[in-house]
């Protein structure tokens, strides 16, 4: 089984720093959009076993790499907040109310 370890790490970072990203909406659609945008900006890091993800996580001890990934998440969160998908739950609820 091939796994993109960066996807798992980015998801964990998104979950950990969700409150600090100040997203307009935190529905699953918007979270997935942020992850997709972020992952398209980083090089994939494939592993063949979930146990090997620890190496990618260990890279985050390097504050510069950790900060770089957080900046990518913050930029992606800003883009999604500015222009949410039509599938965004908050956007759909607002359209229903109006």
Curated annotation (Swiss-Prot):
Q: Does the keyword Transmembrane apply?
A: no
GO biological process annotations for this chain's record? Answer: establishment of competence for transformation
* Entry keywords, A to Z: Competence
Q: Which domain of life is it from?
A: Bacteria
- Xref: Pfam families: ComFB
* Induction comment: Part of the comF operon, encoding comFA, comFB and comFC, transcribed in competence media (minimal salts plus glucose) once stationary phase is reached.
Q: Please describe what happens when the gene is knocked out.
A: 10-fold decrease in transformation efficiency.
As for what it does, the entry says: Involved in transformation (genetic competence for DNA uptake).
What is the protein name given in its UniProt record?
Competence protein ComFB
State the organism named in the record: Bacillus subtilis (strain 168)
């Amino acid at each position: 089984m091939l796994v993109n370890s960066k996807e798992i790490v980015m998801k964990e970072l998104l979950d950990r720093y969700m409150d600090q990203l100040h997203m307009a909406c935190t529905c699953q659609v918007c979270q997935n959009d942020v992850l997709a945008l972020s992952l398209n900006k980083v090089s994939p890091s494939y592993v063949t076993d979930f146990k090997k993800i620890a190496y990618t996580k260990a890279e985050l001890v390097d504050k510069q790499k950790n900060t770089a990934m957080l900046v990518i998440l913050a930029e992606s969160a800003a883009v999604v907040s500015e222009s949410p998908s039509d599938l965004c739950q908050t956007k759909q609820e607002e359209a229903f109310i109006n």
